Amino acid sequence: MLLALLPVLGIHFVLRDAQAQSVTQPDARVTVSEGASLQLRCKYSYSATPYLFWYVQYPRQGLQLLLKYYSGDPVVQGVNGFEAEFSKSNSSFHLRKASVHWSDSAVYFCAVSGFASALTFGSGTKVIVL
């Protein structure tokens, strides 16, 4: 009987874990001049140690991973000059780039997950570089 309950209990904990996590990206759209710096805000809610991610979706393409954080140095270096900083006290994982190029125009998604939970994505921030 107990063996039959284990899969059900496992599903319960995964679903409970997924319900407890959320991601907020307060800026739906950001317009920035080429060569200027960029910061995209991400706040998360998660009761345990989070895995944090930033993804980018360029026009007519799928999601691509920019960077991820689990532990260690709170400043994470990503691809193409992007970096993000983890702040446990502020529950934030803001993405930054010192100087943007027109090719950085895309939609950026922050995401959180736990050890045994699915990714929970923010609503995305559309970046337009002029």
Curated annotation (Swiss-Prot):
Attached carbohydrates are found at: 90
The segment annotated V segment runs over: 21-114
Highest classification ranks of the organism: Eukaryota, Metazoa, Chordata, Craniata, Vertebrata
Keyword Glycoprotein: yes or no?
A: yes
What are the alphabetically sorted keywords of the record?
Adaptive immunity, Glycoprotein, Immunity, Immunoglobulin domain, Receptor, Signal, T cell receptor
Write out the GO cellular component annotations. Answer: T cell receptor complex
Query: Pfam families per the record?
Result: V-set
Could you tell me which cysteines form disulfide bridges?
A: none
Segment J segment: which positions? 115-130
A GO biological process of this protein is: adaptive immune response
Q: What protein does this entry describe?
A: T-cell receptor alpha chain V region PHDS58
Signal peptide positions (record): 1-20
Superkingdom of origin:
Eukaryota
- Could you share any additional remarks the record makes about this protein? This clone was isolated from a cytotoxic T lymphocyte.
